[in-house]
Amino acid sequence: EFGVGGVGSTFRGIALTAALVILIGAGVLYGFGFSDIPDRSERLWASLFHSISAYNNAGFGLWSDSLERYHDNVLVNAVVMVLIVMGGLGWRVTSDLASQGLRRRRRRLSLHTRLVLRTTVLLVVFGALGLALTEWLNRGEVFIGMPWPERWMTALFESVTARTAGFTTVPFSLENITDSGTLLLMTLMFIGASPGGTGGGIKTTTVAALMAATRSTLRGR
């Protein structure tokens, strides 16, 4: 899809997309998410640092408790999740989606984009529901005392960040999470992000291909 002659334009597209997404994320965090930080220069540094870290799926934080102090902050959770997902999707997917939105006549998304989007949504939902089942039903310590909306937000956040980043809004450890919850998080980490994305793992497309092959085998095709 991208020839050798288009390496320069592709590189510029990747750099501009990353810069735009990171700056928007940092702007939202600075203006609203990290509003509890009184010093403006410190708030700006924290906003830029965490926006870059989230988009690149690095998971590095400025505080020893990661993002636990913002466990009930919907905006911080949402912005970090969006940055993680966008970085994990890869430029090829975001470029395809952007060009689709700019076209007057809609065309079908590429097979790669459709495969990545479907698998990503499936994994995020699977991870969130899996954590809800493994921790709530087994009375894991992580969600004790949380109101229900915060429980769902935490489960969704941990499902997103476990695959590729590493941020956390709750004190996860082997002592306060169930064995089934640990296995679920390890599975998500093993799968990771998508090809061309900023995360690691065996990639979402590999999992999608394995699932398709398994389904075909079971159907005798």
PLM segments and residue spans:
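Membrane-proximal intracellular helices of multi-pass ion channels
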Residues: E1-R221
